[in-house]
């Protein structure tokens, strides 16, 4: 039998496989797809993933290098997840090695063993009691026994000191048979603390109908769009579906759009389930992430909660996938492997033959279209749970009105009245910082980023100008860099300025700012929300972070300071995003017994989009928007791919894209493909960013199959273009942002 040739995927942008001989002493029957091997690559070593074992290679036998070591006895990637990675790499036209690498926790990419760590766990012995007479006169032993009784799943040995548990006391208790020690998996990323304080809530008729419809499809793949107004009780439906999943001995994967939603989601699940819960997001350290990932793979975690990348978490017994706030743009990865977690979750659910639920009060137009055409089951929740009323909308025309740090007189009055009534106010402004720019009142100079076609934002608290696009930071000048005068004025308002002004206008009430700057410290978000949940009158000032799934029962007024930005954008998705944001922010008002009110400041109070959204609701807007998309031949009635390029010198990116466009036209003719339009190349909407000049070429197709046939051949050609070596380029399939 000829020597086995190993075809490996390496973590590189090269969209090809690499051939190696098996490591010394490794037999063919030991090998299986998904295993990791350490291999030589040029002057360094890399960790590759085995894709297949074959007998032939295009590389001459004498030039084939042996792999250095086999790192696994079995594949760390289950077959279903390996299959998903193969599909992902092909669909998004991405390197398979990079895709497989993306699916692995960082420590596995670095060669760590794919095995759970074992740890000694101390727990109270069966039948033992803290009232045992043998500890009546031993207070430290009694205290240790009481602590262990509060941790029914046991305490890891390394956590003894954290809980003030004495090893000597435990040894004495062990000798008395009152405690026990066992060796088992230690997974710090999996939570075992459960309060079980919250019983199931009764479902109303709409919730019950949705629950029963999804439950009826539990035996196989079914996709459901749970479209419920804010506060309609979607989460309660999720929880009862998960309970059904756990009772069947299966696991549930729940994706959330933001890290900041993790703690409150985890708390709700811990209150409800006596289950092992893994939390996976970018703030979890590498060790915790690996242990949680392995626990899910081995069936030792029942519920997996995470952000976008948690989609690649393996499950031994998959039973249900839930995508909360499915419309959220955070589910689209914007760098490297540019996948959409919602779309890939649908593929994974189909491959694993399990149900998937997409939930949102403001579904994406793509998901609504799929529901209207029968690809998803559409389940509507039109009433708020518990009898809460929908908020009332008021469009406040601010034309010709004076604005005090962006706040009109009528808005100030409404805020003051709400606070006087003992309630809370949410002030929404989707701009961080103190002001969008700094202006010289003498010569007209404005603070512009030296590396981007963008203005620097004033962050007054730190005395800095910051670019929110490239991260460039400069000290705020004392005098104009152009004319040397000192009359420099912040122009416009951001959350920092609104916070400062509101604190002056309402000195008797706390003003809490919630944005990326104010929540950058660890636990800052939890501390802010703990203050809000006390229910005392206060003002919340924040960006879209406040719009995502948070529950503020004492907020009865939502003040939207500027609703006009989304009405004048070149991005065809801007109006959809604006509508979703307004409805989501508005949904924070009146979620308990108090009715809510939403006041929208606008210079365009009669704009058809705002009128329709506030008077007829999101679904009326969505149906109108879908009609316009159909007429314009835009997604979801078309399929897009965007080729981006950037370079240090002007013209280089366009030069590469011109050549790429010519190659695409040649391939269209050669492959006899139709229904594909090439738009561009054109400069990017922000042409210069982080010191690079950017341009893009858009491909628009009426059908997906011919577009992907073109992309497969086109990418091979692009990788060979000499002009591509002078630029940084990437392909984005199904782009969400056309920036």
Regions found by a protein language model. Give the residues of each.
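A short, contiguous, amphipathic alpha-helix enriched in charged residues
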Residues: 5, 17, 32-33, 651-666
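Generic non-transmembrane alpha-helical segments
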Residues: 659-671, 710-721
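Accessory, non-ATPase domains that flank or precede helicase/AAA+ motor cores in DNA-metabolism machines
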Residues: 1-360, 367, 372-388, 420, ...
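Short beta-strand elements
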Residues: 512, 668-684, 725-733
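A general secondary-structure junction signal
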Residues: 52-54, 104, 183-185, 429-431, ...
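Inter-lobe coupling/hinge segments of SF2-like helicase ATPases
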Residues: 198-204, 208-212, 220-654, 658, ...
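Small-residue-enriched segments and motifs
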Residues: 3-8, 20, 48, 393, ...
């Amino acid at each position: 039998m000829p020597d086995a040739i190993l075809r490996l995927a390496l973590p590189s942008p090269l969209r090809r496989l690499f051939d190696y001989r098996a490591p010394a002493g490794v037999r063919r029957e030991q090998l299986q797809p998904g295993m990791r091997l350490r291999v030589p690559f040029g002057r360094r070593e890399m960790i590759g993933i085995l894709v297949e074992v074959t007998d032939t290679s295009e590389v001459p036998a004498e030039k084939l290098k042996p792999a250095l070591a086999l790192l696994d006895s079995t594949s760390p990637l289950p077959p279903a997840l390996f299959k998903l990675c193969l599909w992902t790499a092909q669909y998004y036209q991405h390197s398979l090695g990079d895709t497989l690498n993306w699916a692995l926790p960082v420590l596995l990419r670095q060669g760590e063993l794919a095995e759970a760590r074992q740890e000694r766990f101390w727990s109270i012995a069966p039948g033992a009691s803290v009232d045992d007479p043998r500890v009546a006169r031993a207070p430290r032993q009694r205290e240790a026994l009481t602590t262990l009784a509060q941790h029914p799943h046991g305490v890891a040995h390394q956590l003894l000191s954290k809980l003030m548990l004495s090893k000597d006391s435990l040894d004495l208790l062990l000798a008395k048979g009152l405690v026990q020690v066992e060796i088992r998996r230690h997974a710090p990323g999996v939570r075992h603390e459960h309060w079980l304080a919250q019983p199931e809530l009764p479902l109303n008729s709409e919730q019950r109908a949705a629950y029963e419809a999804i439950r009826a499809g539990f035996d196989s793949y079914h996709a459901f769009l749970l479209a419920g107004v804010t506060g309609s009780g979607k989460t309660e439906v999720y929880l009862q579906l998960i309970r059904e999943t756990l009772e069947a001995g299966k696991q549930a994967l729940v994706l959330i759009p933001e890290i900041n939603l993790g703690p409150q989601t985890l708390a709700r699940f811990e209150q409800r389930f006596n289950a092992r819960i893994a939390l996976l997001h970018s703030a979890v350290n590498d060790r915790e992430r690996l242990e949680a990932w392995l626990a899910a793979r081995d069936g030792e975690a029942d519920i997996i909660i995470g952000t976008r990348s948690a989609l690649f978490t393996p499950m031994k017994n998959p039973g249900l996938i839930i995508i909360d706030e499915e419309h959220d743009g955070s589910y689209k990865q914007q760098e490297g492997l540019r996948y959409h977690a919602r779309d890939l979750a649908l593929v994974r659910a189909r491959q694993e033959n399990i149900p998937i639920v997409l939930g949102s009060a403001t579904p994406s137009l793509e998901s609504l279209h799929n529901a209207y055409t029968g690809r998803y089951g559409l389940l509507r929740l039109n009433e708020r749970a518990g009898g809460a009323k929908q908020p009332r909308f008021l469009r406040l025309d601010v034309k010709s009105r004076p604005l005090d740090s962006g706040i009109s007189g009528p808005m100030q009055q409404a805020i003051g009245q709400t606070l006087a009534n003992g309630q809370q106010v949410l002030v929404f402004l989707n701009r961080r910082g103190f002001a969008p720019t700094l202006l010289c009142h003498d010569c007209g100079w404005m603070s512009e980023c030296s590396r981007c076609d963008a203005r620097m934002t004033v962050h007054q608290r730190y005395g800095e100008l910051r670019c929110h696009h490239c991260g460039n930071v400069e000290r705020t000048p004392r005098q104009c860099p152009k004319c040397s005068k000192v009359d420099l004025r912040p122009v416009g308002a951001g959350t920092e300025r609104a916070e400062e002004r509101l604190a002056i206008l309402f000195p008797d009430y706390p003003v809490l700012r919630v944005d990326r700057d104010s929540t950058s410290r660890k636990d800052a978000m939890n501390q802010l929300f703990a203050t809000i949940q006390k229910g005392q009158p206060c003002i919340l000032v924040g960006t879209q972070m406040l719009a995502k799934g948070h529950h503020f029962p004492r907020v009865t007024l939502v003040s939207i300071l500027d609703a006009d930005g989304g009405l004048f954008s070149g991005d065809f998705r801007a109006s959809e995003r604006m509508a979703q944001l307004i409805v989501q922010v508005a949904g924070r008002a009146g979620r308990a017994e108090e009715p809510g009110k939403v006041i929208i400041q606008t210079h365009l109070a009669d704009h058809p989009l705002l009128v329709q959204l506030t008077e007829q609701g999101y679904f009326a807007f969505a149906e109108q928007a879908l009609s316009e998309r159909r007429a314009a031949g835009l997604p979801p009635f078309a399929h897009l791919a965007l080729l981006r390029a950037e370079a240090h010198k002007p013209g280089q990116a366009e030069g590469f894209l011109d050549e790429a466009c010519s190659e695409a036209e040649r391939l269209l003719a050669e492959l006899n493909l139709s229904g594909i339009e090439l738009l561009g190349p054109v400069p990017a909407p922000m042409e210069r960013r982080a010191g690079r000049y950017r341009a893009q070429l858009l491909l628009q197709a009426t059908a997906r199959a011919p577009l992907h046939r073109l992309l497969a051949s086109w990418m091979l050609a692009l990788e060979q273009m000499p002009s591509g070596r002078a630029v940084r380029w990437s392909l984005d399939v199904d782009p969400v942002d056309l920036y």
